[in-house]
Amino acid sequence: YYRKKLRTGKGLAVHCNHKVVAVYVFIMLACVLFTVWTLYTGKIEICYGENEFTVQAEGWQDYTVKYDAIDRIACEENMFRDTNTIRTNGFGNLKYSMGHFRDEIHADYIRYTHNDCDTYVVMEVEGSTVILNGADDAQTREIYNNIRERMEK
């Protein structure tokens, strides 16, 4: 059949429904936009109260810590360079890591961090490890100093 059509010069006509093509293009663009949006969205803010602070996380649940529940606090650098960190429950993208994690250094811990900053505030809170940071080293050290000052009151 195909060879006959080619010999006569007619070839095969391809019919496409332009509405179907438009729907497929729309769905594909929506998927691409959603993927890009998810890779770069989120926000982490720390709100300090008199007795506690709250990590407000856009894209994941907020986390509140009472100052008197903090057993130990430290500011550490480059903790996750050579570790095999696994997110066990949470949210993460190219900018943020939030939720429950596991690695060989801290075992199971809670983390609300910016991925571009290698300085971290590490706290032991009632037997659990909580790790925070800011967008850069200066913000992280400010978080550390703010929490430390409020713990001493």
Range-by-range predicted roles:
Residues L12, D62-T85, A138-K153:
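A signal for specific C-terminal beta-sheet/loop modules enriched in small/flexible residues
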Residues Y1-K43:
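Alpha-helical transmembrane spans
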Residues A57-V65, R72-E126:
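Non-transmembrane, membrane-adjacent beta-strand/coil modules in membrane-associated proteins
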Residues T35-Y67, R72-A74:
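Conserved beta-hairpin
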Residues V21-V32, G49-E50, E77-F91:
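Short low-complexity stretches enriched in small and charged residues
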Residues Y1-K5, G9-G11, H114-K153:
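Terminal and domain-flanking low-complexity segments
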Residues Y24-I27, V32-T35, K43-I44, E50-F53, ...:
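A short linear-motif detector with a strong N-terminal bias
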